[in-house]
Amino acid sequence: MKVDIGERIKYWRKEKGITQDTLAKKADIPYTTLAKIESKIVTNPRMETLIKIAAGLEITVDELITK
């Protein structure tokens, strides 16, 4: 089964009650990068980016991908 990483990030971001802009700042990534991942323009982000996003969400990469 393929994980829709954009949907997973959006789910966790909304679960945490934060905006894309806030998450981008917490993850130290460009807002446009996050927006492209969530809107499925970028479907295979780099692992480094996923690690930063997970840290910004205060979850593990495993939680981001599997839960």
What positions do the PLM features span?
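A short, Lys/Arg-rich alpha-helix, primarily the initiator
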Residues: M1-E15
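Alpha-helical residues within the helix-turn-helix
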Residues: K14, K25, A55
